[in-house]
Amino acid sequence: MFCPFCRHPDSRVVDSRTSDDGLSIRRRRQCPECGRRFSTTETASLSVIKRNGVVEPFSREKIVTGVRKACQGRPVTDTDLAVLAQRVEEAIRATGASQIEANDIGLSILPPLRELDEVAYLRFASVYQGFDSLDDFESAIAQLRVAHAATPDADAL
């Protein structure tokens, strides 16, 4: 790795530690030429294949932005959205794939969003899964009610 100060083509790793809840590695490096220290961050690249075939880098912020619309007017904080986006990214990275289709990201969002807020879940699912009629909503609500009945301390819908 080139030193950002003197452009020497080598550096020595002084310290390494995980950051971003284990999704990246932060390394402190020292240049053997000028002796100055600098930090680098390493992450495994993850790309998204969009519906039109375009490939772009994965962005947690896009998840937050998309889910925020479904959560408008709901008791969901920015911290809740950040945690949800992190959970989605962790689930995607756990697959071991370096590329993922946008559709699969949407499917990965649904379970943690359902746990976070069921109304936001219905809003997101209605757009994402293309609900066309009241029957689609009724079916989704019926599934939520069945899940509530199976959970002893669940709130009623």
From Swiss-Prot:
Q: Which domain of life is it from?
A: Bacteria
Against InterPro entries, the record matches this protein to: ATP-cone_dom, NrdR-like_N, RNR_NrdR-like
Q: Which PANTHER family match?
A: TRANSCRIPTIONAL REPRESSOR NRDR (PTHR30455:SF2)
Q: Quick check: keyword Transmembrane in the entry?
A: no
Q: What does this protein do?
A: Negatively regulates transcription of bacterial ribonucleotide reductase nrd genes and operons by binding to NrdR-boxes.
* GO MF: ATP binding; DNA binding; zinc ion binding
Residue ranges constituting the ATP-cone domain according to the UniProt record: 46-136
Family designation: Belongs to the NrdR family.
* Keyword annotations from UniProtKB, A to Z: ATP-binding, DNA-binding, Metal-binding, Nucleotide-binding, Repressor, Transcription, Transcription regulation, Zinc, Zinc-finger
User: What is this protein called in UniProt?
Assistant: Transcriptional repressor NrdR
The UniProt entry's GO biological process terms, in alphabetical order, are: negative regulation of DNA-templated transcription
Q: How is the cofactor bound?
A: Binds 1 zinc ion.
Named cofactor requirement(s): Zn(2+)
Q: Where are the zinc fingers (unnamed)?
A: 3-34
